[in-house]
Amino acid sequence: MQFSINTKEFVRVLSSIQGIIDKAGQNQQSILSYVYLQAIDSQLIVNATNFNLTFVDRLEATVEVEGAICVKAQRLLQIMKTLHGSVTKISLSKTEMRLNISCGKSKFNTKECNPPDDFPPYNPPKSDKTLSISNKVLRRVLIETVFSVKPEREEINGAHVEVINKESGNFLRMVTTDGHRLSISEGLFAGDMDETAVDRKLLPQKALQELLSLTATYGEQDWTITFGDRQACFSIEKLEFSFSLNDGKFPDYNKICSKLSPDKNVILEKKEFSSILKRVGVFTSKNTPSVKFSLSDQNLDISIKNPDMGSFNEDIPVNYQGDNLEISFSFHFFQDLLGALDAENVQLGLNGSMNPCLVTVPGRDDCQFIIMPMRNSS
């Protein structure tokens, strides 16, 4: 095997697989801590897996001798990140299992190689139906949901995914919860999937995190998504990212949403709201994580009292007339949500001191968020 490849692109791809490689476990001799490289035609195929997640990408390469090898992934990335030339030449020694890497005057050889047949075969999910969604939309949906996943419980350790068919188009919806908050976000897609095709899949948290990282490296391209019975595959350009789906049964979130009936609605400027929460955070602690909202005519007072640290409060003028209301929420829940939203304003829908808060974005009907209240400790 002998080929030349763009150094920067190879580093980018090797960096992308590290989250998968790290999952291989503490046995560093495991083949799962290796990356599979195959030079064929005019491309280099890069494959990494931990059985639950599989990453396959194809890079343009000048291939002089075709072949394949497994190389310790972290070591290969360490080597490649030290190289400064635009092109790196890589070859496999004919006499022993050793990979030679050269760039400019720098020359490495690594013995941490295994035969290609040791690597697990790649079996992507098969389905006649796929959908296409823009990278920008998929990234927004992921950002607006991944923060409220509960990793400790199998049935909610991931994003519930379903297809919603509306008159305005077909939407891919993701729903996440940790039992104390619920996030719903959806994005328009192109394709022939109907509501029965996806059949309420549960995407695991680790896959969501890897997808979120991958979307940051692409621009206006589209993702093609395929759902099998037990697997899903997200592909873009020459990259395929496939993973096993979770078995858990997600709670009936529609039942939760149908019980909401907020009669007090307040619109806040997100930037100002976030700024106040930062000041609230000065006095939050493990024993005092809640922030109190006191709503009255034309005013919302946000406050915290920590018996060990001190207190803070700040008023926001609001367009509200009605009964007074005091309600407390986790400071971190609102902080997480505001950090995920790209919006100028947010609307809080309230109804009583022990009922959930419905958070929406004015002018948008593709997302909503539910936050459970806390007992007022201040």
Regions found by a protein language model. Give the residues of each.
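Structural preference for solvent-exposed beta-strand-turn elements
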Residues: 1-378
